Curated annotation (Swiss-Prot):
Biological function: One of several proteins that assist in the late maturation steps of the functional core of the 30S ribosomal subunit. Associates with free 30S ribosomal subunits (but not with 30S subunits that are part of 70S ribosomes or polysomes). Required for efficient processing of 16S rRNA. May interact with the 5'-terminal helix region of 16S rRNA.
Compartments it resides in: Cytoplasm
Keyword Cell inner membrane: no
PROSITE patterns the record matches: RBFA (PS01319)
Gene that this sequence comes from: rbfA
Keywords for this protein: Cytoplasm, Ribosome biogenesis
NCBIfam families: rbfA (TIGR00082)
Assembly with partners or alone: Monomer. Binds 30S ribosomal subunits, but not 50S ribosomal subunits or 70S ribosomes.
Principal localisation: cytoplasm
Protein name: Ribosome-binding factor A
HAMAP family: RbfA
Organism: Synechococcus sp. (strain JA-3-3Ab) (Cyanobacteria bacterium Yellowstone A-Prime)
Keyword presence, Cytoplasm: yes
Amino acid sequence: MATARRVARVAELIKREVSQILLSEIKDDRVGAGMVSIVDVEVSNDLQNARIFVSIYGDEAAQQQTMEGLASATPFVRREIGQRLGLRRVPTVVFLQDRSLERGSRVLALLNQLRQPAEAQQQEGSHPGVEGRMADTPGGEEDELSEQQ
């Protein structure tokens, strides 16, 4: 078992090297169909498995095509990682699509939709007379006290 520090360091090195490989080494046109960026790399504690999370910009067809290209390039990527990092055992590489950015933007859109009707209700519900009465309250109380005396 590797220490947590070593696992994190290997994950960061894999992330850097795979980014370079995707940028300049892979010749498969399917990988270039959508803009690919590596979001995160998770390496198991025994350094045997590496899950590479990628974010792909493009429509659904381009994303699917890019994932197919990455799947076919996996043996090449694994071999390159082994040569560049010099690890005794090269981790098995799996590319996974990270959809957290899509989910985050969808949540933000839903929040904006909820906020717009709430703001409209606040604008309709605010009455200028209410603010005026609140300002008059201290004076009104004094008038009542002076009348009672």
